[in-house]
């Protein structure tokens, strides 16, 4: 389906991020391409170390890209210096994985939520700042009685609500959700996911939702990108990816999801065996080759390097 460029809030072209190590360059993000429509969610899923969090941080320029282009809301921001990026910080935000380690333990809830409002001069008077801070607490479902509490006095769910309120404080268009529920109990996870979905509906937010949990990403995402060793190996709508996975790595990930067994039918699991290729000085071949039976049988004649369906 063709798309109007005005519908695209973020386009990433051949994004790379390499880190120097004593043994050579570590390919954390290597040639990533995608687009996101306004008001939708792109889920990025993969094993630990695949580069999904680095992708999110590089898009926000919390770490500088090695190469490629980042086009946000029609502007190429790739070469923006810190001063120019500062103005964009009110349009792009992040929710971190661990709400405890990402919050200053010396600050109260009032101080934590009001900090972005003060930092970006969104409100000037103390009364305005206090009023908006309380409004943000209401928005994320954090009772006002906790306004003078400190992070260590709250449970994980309430701490994550503080993180969400901080992200919302600048009234962003795009939020990178970096494993926002992985540190929470399952019952609390559902509450936070429902909150994020409601906020998206009410405020028209666009999310990049980073996770290793396939059941969560299916529930939460419009499109899903699967990453392996710095590359997006497959991208499709949520339904397409789960109903008809194409890349062998995607098939193996989906096969590992525990499902209830009905009657005597039992789903055959595709176990991933073999050693993970080192991300340092990667050869120019399929990175899943050492762990993929399909690749071993057909390489080099037919190798699944990247499969993209959907918005590109």
Regions found by a protein language model. Give the residues of each.
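Conserved ABC ATPase "signature" region
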Residues: 76, 118, 127-145, 254-255
